[in-house]
A protein has these predicted regions:
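Boundary/linker segments flanking structured domains
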Residues: 1-51, 58-184
Length: 184
């Protein structure tokens, strides 16, 4: 059976106050139950090498980041954080893990495995067709972004990831980096 997920990403929470801003935003928007997150930052003494973390959470993302042993503690400077909410379904643990794995697998191929902090599945292929649609929202205005910054982690994750399994059990990955408006 095909799986289709619409993920609304809210961000980007930037700079030194990113975690505090995220914590306040989550408190003021309890209707947004965010189960996914994207982080971009730098390890200690790193000047140019950017590292990424993609993960899932059942609790608030800010609480998840405070957990002992979380990858965010490896980042000395956090450039940005995005949190993702499922808009078309109430996901169970398997659905959240499926989307997380597909995003990690795709991002690993884009930025390179050494730059990914979470490497639980850098080579993953689900057994069924899976479609992930991403929409990017400004967390302060709750309006959809027309464009995101050139260096944003939102540029790495495409608006559409379509994973197809053919009748011959061959895996095919289709993406659309950014959808464009057709009607105004």
């Amino acid at each position: 059976m095909d799986k289709v997920f619409l993920v609304r990403w809210y961000g980007s929470f930037n700079g030194e106050d990113a975690l505090d801003e995220l914590r306040l935003w989550e408190r003021s928007h309890p209707e947004c139950e965010c189960n996914l997150y994207l982080i971009r930052g730098y390890k200690k003494h790193a000047k140019t090498t950017t590292h990424y973390d993609i993960g899932q959470t059942i609790q608030d993302a800010a609480k998840r980041f405070a957990n002992q042993g979380h990858h965010i503690n490896e980042l000395h400077r956090i450039s940005e954080i995005w949190v993702g909410c499922f808009a078309n379904t109430v996901p169970d643990k398997k659905d959240i893990s499926l989307v997380e794995r597909m995003l990690i697998c795709y991002a690993s191929s884009e930025v390179g495995n050494p730059n990914m902090l979470n490497q639980i599945c850098t080579d993953y292929a689900p057994p069924q067709n899976v479609y992930i649609l991403s929409e990017w929202y400004n967390y302060t205005t709750l309006k959809q972004y027309e464009r995101v910054r050139r260096d944003s982690v939102a540029k790495i994750i495409p608006d559409v990831i379509a994973y197809r399994v053919t009748e011959e059990k061959t895996s095919i990955l289709f993406i659309s980096e950014k959808l464009k408006k057709y009607w105004y």
